[in-house]
Curated annotation (Swiss-Prot):
The keyword Magnesium applies. Mg(2+) 1 binds at E66, D82, I84. It comes from Chlorobaculum parvum (strain DSM 263 / NCIMB 8327). Keywords: Amino-acid biosynthesis, Histidine biosynthesis, Hydrolase, Magnesium, Metal-binding. Pathway: Amino-acid biosynthesis; L-histidine biosynthesis; L-histidine from 5-phospho-alpha-D-ribose 1-diphosphate: step 8/9. This is Histidinol-phosphatase. NCBIfam families: his_9_HisN (TIGR02067). It holds the Pfam family Inositol_P. Mg(2+) 2 binds at D82, D85, D207. It is an enzyme of class 3 (hydrolase).
């Protein structure tokens, strides 16, 4: 295990334990950010813990997180942090939130760690080394038929938006099972072979950075609503097993050419 991955795992576990001290509290303090999304004291304290741990070990590395200003990199390495992905779930006592840490090196995601402390599930991946949950390898499913697939989503707009011919939107009709197990948990269901497609129509870099290496090292793929696999600044995030991902990307490409 590289020092980078070891540090990410240690900090994700420490931050996860911190969040559990707040999880389920009726007295939890919730604030509104400028974009009207919620943030809690647990979000801020967890990100501070992670930032301090990284800076102590790698002081020249960049830091880019959801809750605080970016600290620029001096060496091409940038850590991307989402201290609590699924803050709304966290606030309501739903255990499907995750602590996310990723390392980007020269613009490419090198590793990702996602800890679900309330579930006891810890995912990790480093480029070329496979993906793991609690130390055991995980792999995407081989299901290729829409009718046999499980599709999960985060935002209610996925179901409520007007009918669309977009291949990803069409899955809400064609899939065998559609459920709202969203945020990073949905993407880890894909990585571990328990779902075939996860859809996020609204996405920020910290929401997807750790997801990408884990899904890809598990044999899956990540792309945006235009079928592009360069998605940090893309239009949403779709993760899928390899079979369905290839089909969706091809169908999106055909639709783009027909416009």
């Amino acid at each position: 295990m590289t020092p980078d991955l070891q540090l990410a795992l240690e900090l994700a576990e420490k931050a996860g334990k911190l969040t559990l001290d707040y999880f389920g509290r009726r007295s939890l303090q919730v604030f509104s950010k400028r974009d009207d999304t919620p943030v809690t004291e647990a979000d801020r304290n967890a990100e501070e813990l992670i930032r301090q741990g990284i800076s102590a070990k790698f002081p020249d590395d960049g830091l880019f997180g959801e809750e605080f200003d970016e600290h620029p990199s001096g060496n091409g390495r940038r850590w991307i942090i989402d201290p609590i992905d699924g803050t709304r779930s966290f606030i309501h006592g739903v255990p499907l939130y995750g602590v996310m840490i990723a390392l980007e090196v020269e613009g490419a995601m090198q590793l990702g760690v996602i800890n679900f402390p309330a579930l006891g599930e810890l995912y990790q991946a480093e480029r070329g080394s496979g993906a793991f949950m609690n130390g055991s390898p995980v792999q995407v499913s081989a299901i290729a038929e829409n009718s046999a697939s499980t599709v999960v989503f985060t935002e209610k707009e996925y179901l409520l938006d007007p009918p669309s011919n977009h291949p990803v939107d069409q899955l809400r009709i064609d899939a065998g099972l559609v459920r709202g197990w969203g945020d990073c948990y949905g993407h880890m269901l894909v990585a571990s072979g328990r779902a075939e497609v996860a859809v996020d129509k609204i996405m920020s870099p910290w929401d997807c950075a750790a997801v990408i290496p884990i899904v890809e090292e598990a044999g899956g793929c990540c792309f945006d609503y235009r079928g592009r696999q360069s998605i940090i600044d893309g239009e949403g995030l779709v993760s899928a097993n390899n079979a369905m991902g290839r089909n969706l990307i091809a169908a999106i490409g055909n639709g783009e050419r027909d416009r």
